[in-house]
């Protein structure tokens, strides 16, 4: 799995989070939070058996896409799990936090009341069952570079203001993104 991490976490952040909510996180997941503190995972798919889901984000601590912010919408006490990420459609991935399910990863479909559907016995297994594609160089090219490419290919008639706006948004989103392989 490739991730554009939110920055390094710290053992202090993780321990403070665990104390605040009275939970103990799986050791591998703790190491993940310390090393990456979550991040964006564009072009990432989790596949295991017949299950196939996009993975858009893995949440971190004290960042925009945070575990705590998403706990507000997710009945984590009832589910004995906390939200750790999301797919492209607003569904959650969660990780077990009780003695009986610690470290188990679930898919939580919002159309099914966020019911826990087990997809991996461990967070490490979840990471290993994902596949990511690198963000293409085209996605990182400027509007001007894209226009020049279409004109060179005789397709200038396809260029519209709407397309330029789409390109501009994509460029701004991906121009500085750095993806790295998540530890296994």
Please describe what each predicted stretch is:
Residues 1-92, 158-184:
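A surface-exposed partner-binding patch
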Residues 39-152:
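Long, low-complexity, intrinsically disordered segments enriched in glycines and aromatic residues
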Residues 150, 154-160:
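Protein C-terminal end segments and domain termini
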């Amino acid at each position: 799995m490739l991730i554009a991490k939110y920055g390094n976490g710290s053992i202090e952040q993780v321990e403070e989070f665990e104390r605040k909510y009275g939970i103990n996180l799986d050791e591998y997941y703790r190491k993940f939070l310390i090393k990456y503190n979550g991040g964006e995972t564009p072009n990432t798919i989790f596949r295991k058996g017949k299950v196939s889901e996009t993975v858009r984000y893995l949440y971190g601590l004290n960042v925009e896409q945070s575990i705590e912010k998403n706990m507000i919408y997710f009945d984590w006490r009832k589910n004995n799990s906390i939200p750790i990420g999301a797919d492209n459609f607003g569904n959650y991935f969660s990780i077990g936090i009780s003695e009986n399910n610690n470290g188990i990863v679930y898919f939580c479909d919002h159309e099914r009341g966020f019911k826990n559907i087990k997809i991996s016995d461990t967070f490490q297994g979840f990471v290993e069952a994902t596949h990511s594609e690198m963000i293409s160089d085209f996605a990182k090219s400027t509007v001007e570079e894209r226009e020049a490419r279409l004109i060179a290919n005789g397709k200038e008639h396809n260029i519209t203001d709407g397309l330029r706006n789409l390109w501009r948004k994509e460029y701004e989103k991906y121009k500085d993104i750095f993806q790295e392989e998540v530890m296994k």
